[in-house]
Amino acid sequence: MRNCIESLLPGGEEVEIIIVDDGSTKDRTAEIADEYAAKYPTIVKAVHQENGGHGQAVNTGLKNATGLYFKVVDSDDWLDKDNYPKVLAKLAELVHQGNAPDMMICNYIYDKQGAKHKKAVRYASAFPLDEVFTWRDVKHFRLGQYILMHSVIYRTHMLKECGLELPKHTFYVDNIFVYYPLPYV
């Protein structure tokens, strides 16, 4: 979890980090969340709730989000130190130009613990690279080229307006999180 949070901190004041403690009892999640919130009070917010599962944790994060964009980063995930600033800079540039996208899709690496190889999922063959596009510009996806929760950044207001609410006590809510908002993009 610390690795995850540390990977987000370089975003500085441009990023709002919401740590949702989903009723953890067998680890130090609550303590670590409070520690970071105390150390970085203008960036990190710790939210504690009874266990509601992954979907409810995402709902709580979204409910507490005040930033322009919303991205789910699970506690065992981290953002690449070289690409994270580029993503933030691109979003800032688009917003400054008055062309704020509802959704940004980013490549990601699936690094399963114990696996011999990492799996890189890239979208260059399906989406135009480094430009704003519409659904008409989307090409065919390759096998294994899924859009997952880890690859999307949504405009917060749009997510709230579309009424996205993930089921409680449910894991693998990626498809709902990714695909429910698409008609609003």
Predicted region positions:
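Nucleotide-sugar donor-binding/catalytic module of glycosyltransferases
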Residues: 1-185
